[in-house]
């Protein structure tokens, strides 16, 4: 599937309130942590199509990676797997986080080894 086909087939997601609250419990603290470490964890609403990762993390020096936040043990959806493959094929790093504190450890490692 081409990039344009993926973007045209994808539609905006509407998560249930319970899912948003559970994801916010992990996602929002990570965003604050990223800020404290000189990075930005952006939710790209223009690109927020079904399957696109939850956060695009931009760091000093032009370093970028993507994070998908999931409930513990929940696998990626089919469109998320397509987006993951697309981003990896362009050379970006892509992570799936399903535990509190996991994204913070990923950011620490990314900053330590990408300089």
Q: What are the residue ranges of the model-derived segments?
A:
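Catalytic phosphate/metal-binding cores of nucleic-acid and nucleotide-processing enzymes, i.e., regions
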Residues: 1-115
């Amino acid at each position: 599937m081409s990039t344009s086909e993926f973007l045209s087939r994808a539609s905006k997601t509407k998560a249930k309130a319970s899912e948003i609250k559970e994801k916010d419990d992990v996602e929002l603290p990570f965003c604050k942590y990223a800020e404290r470490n000189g990075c930005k964890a952006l939710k790209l609403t223009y690109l927020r199509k079904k399957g696109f990762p939850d956060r695009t993390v931009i760091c000093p020096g032009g370093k970028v990676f993507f994070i998908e936040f999931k409930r513990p043990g929940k696998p990626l959806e089919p469109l998320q797997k397509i987006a993951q493959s697309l981003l990896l094929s362009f050379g970006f790093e892509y992570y799936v986080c399903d535990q509190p504190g996991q994204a913070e450890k990923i950011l620490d490692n990314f900053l330590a080894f990408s300089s």
